[in-house]
Amino acid sequence: MDKRHDPSRRIIAPHGSQLSCKSWLTEAPMRMLMNNLHPDVAERPEDLVVYGGIGRAARDWDCYDKIIEVLKRLEDDETLMVQSGKPVGVFRTHADAPRVLIANSNLVPHWANWEHFNELDKQGLAMYGQMTAGSWIYIGTQGIVQGTYETFVAVAKQHFGGVAAGKWILTGGLGGMGGAQTLAGTMAGFSVLACEVDETRIDFRLRTRYVDKKATSLDEALAMINDANASGKPVSVGLLANAADIFAELVKRGITPDVVTDQTSAHDPLNGYLPQGWTMAQAADMRKTDEAAVVKAAKASMAVQVQAMLDLQAAGAATLDYGNNIRQMAFETGVKNAFDFPGFVPAYIRPLFCEGIGPFRWVALSGDPEDIYKTDAKVKELIPDNPHLHNWLDMARERIAFQGLPARICWVGLKDRARLAQAFNEMVKNGELSAPIVIGRDHLDSGSVASPNRETESMMDGSDAVSDWPLLNALLNTASGATWVSLHHGGGVGMGFSQHSGVVIVCDGTEAAAKRVGRVLWNDPATGVMRHADAGYEIAKNCAKEQGLDLPMLKD
């Protein structure tokens, strides 16, 4: 019997202002853990899988139940320790210490590979936390929509003079992360053709308004794209097909998309990528009997897909890796020029990271969408001179369906995060909001991750693989008074390829919270500016000087 599987479970976080725990500092992590497993949020909630292949919220259902039990009794001077999804200890700390400290999927570097991790996972000794799955701050596909939107806007500026109309994107994957591509692409003005092997995922994205149409053949999908481009109104199409098959077929037909990328779960060849010619059922059976054969076949198909991406790039498509490590998998399978197309961070996002700008997100613990709409208005009020941000907030309200507890994401940086958070805290204090707000972020942020094939690819000083930075980030956020802090390994790109940290803080309207959010939400993005200034980026150096950061080795 698999203790991780229970189809009878249907988890819905409490709404409203009534507490189940002893304070909002423990109620918040409880609600957010539960929200990660909401049926409209998680990919496979019955298996505790939130997104990203096997990214889980808790190690098994016994651990989940115990975490909830402990959070309900936890005092405001105690800290719960969670080791790979398992609650292992409660310790007396102090009121400004985190209520929960989480470490997920971390392995000593020599053993940091999927083979060793999968053995531990089978024995119930480890859990893959992805990024926000095991750190309890996943907000559904919205969590990556704006970052994807910002990337596609940058693609349009760099390659098409800022005009995406009449252009289309080819991609793969409509899971929890990949599902953002279709909506983000149409928001940026592109049409999008996304290949997905799991029809339930296409249907899920249709239901949550992330995909406009479904197709079952390439010809049908291309007709939809062509009609949309002719009409000038972008469309997103979920095509039920294997990405490797479709990418290669387009090369064969001589059809070149304007933009090519991919967001299948290629980071996990065992659980995340369906080999060409295989059915979902066949893959599920083979995972039980011959894991090595599954991995070999998956990586062979990834090689086909990446070769097609290279061929499409040579034919004129703007081609980018969207952070799932598919280039690495293809490289290991013989595609020696797999890295000839860039990752999205060095190509389009790094200047934002240099100013500590990244995926700032918040959630209304009340469950009331009005609380989010009021905070949207507050963001516009406090940042009046950023029409791009205002446009994003307007589009988000109009086009993004909330999944689980209402939430919002917008990319802001060092200059704005702390003051926005303090304004939200004041709104809770004066009753404008009906319950506290939690503020967090993706681990994909400027100072919280070391990932040489994604966020820290091609650092100008060669420090791509130095992982001191996310460790320092987690330590500083703990010292600063975050409500919960997490330190993970392997998110986004898989075992052995990343280390990263997460932070969440509660705005409960108290003076103590105002002080904590002021520290945490200044220090957290400041570590990103510090990291990039240390690597030599002038934008980061200038930002550090403008904001008065004390960086001892930064020369005047």
Swiss-Prot record:
EC number per UniProt: 4.2.1.49
Active-site feature positions: 410
Keywords per UniProt: Cytoplasm, Histidine metabolism, Lyase, NAD
Principal location: cytoplasm
SUPFAM superfamilies from the UniProt entry: Urocanase
Cofactors, names only: NAD(+)
Lineage, uppermost ranks: Bacteria, Pseudomonadati, Pseudomonadota, Gammaproteobacteria, Alteromonadales
HAMAP family from the UniProt entry: HutU
Subcellular location as annotated: Cytoplasm
Reported function: Catalyzes the conversion of urocanate to 4-imidazolone-5-propionate.
UniProt record, GO biological process: L-histidine catabolic process to glutamate and formamide; L-histidine catabolic process to glutamate and formate
Cofactor note text: Binds 1 NAD(+) per subunit.
Protein name: Urocanate hydratase
GO CC term (a single one): cytoplasm
Organism, scientific name: Shewanella sp. (strain MR-4)
Sequence positions that bind NAD(+): 52-53, 130, 176-178, 196, 201, 242-243, 263-267, 273-274, 322, 492
Similarity comment: family membership: Belongs to the urocanase family.
Gene Ontology terms for molecular function: urocanate hydratase activity
